[in-house]
Amino acid sequence: MRKGVHPKNNLVVFKDGSNGAMFLTRSTLNSKETIKYIDGKEYPLITVEITSKSHPFYTGQQKFVDAAGRIDKFNKRYKKS
């Protein structure tokens, strides 16, 4: 790799703002805030609004919209006579 071209990546903790779940991963993001992770080391902290630990799709809490009922209602309303 050429020096000075690629961004520096380092270990960062991402914290879910809604439930407090934390993930340690590599990122090019950096922060002035730090947090002591469960391994005892301090890492930059990035707080995010939603993660796979709180998003309804991943937690199984999602609700499906009854699209078939809406389509039938539309067809019934605008049916050609």
UniProtKB/Swiss-Prot annotation:
Keywords: Ribonucleoprotein, Ribosomal protein. GO terms for molecular function: structural constituent of ribosome. SUPFAM superfamilies: L28p-like. PROSITE patterns: RIBOSOMAL_L31. The keyword Ribonucleoprotein applies. The keyword Ribonucleoprotein applies. Pfam families: Ribosomal_L31 (PF01197). It comes from the Bacteria. GO terms for biological process: translation. Coiled coil: none annotated. GO terms for cellular component: ribonucleoprotein complex; ribosome. Belongs to the bacterial ribosomal protein bL31 family. Type B subfamily. Part of the 50S ribosomal subunit. This is Large ribosomal subunit protein bL31B. It comes from Borreliella afzelii (strain PKo).
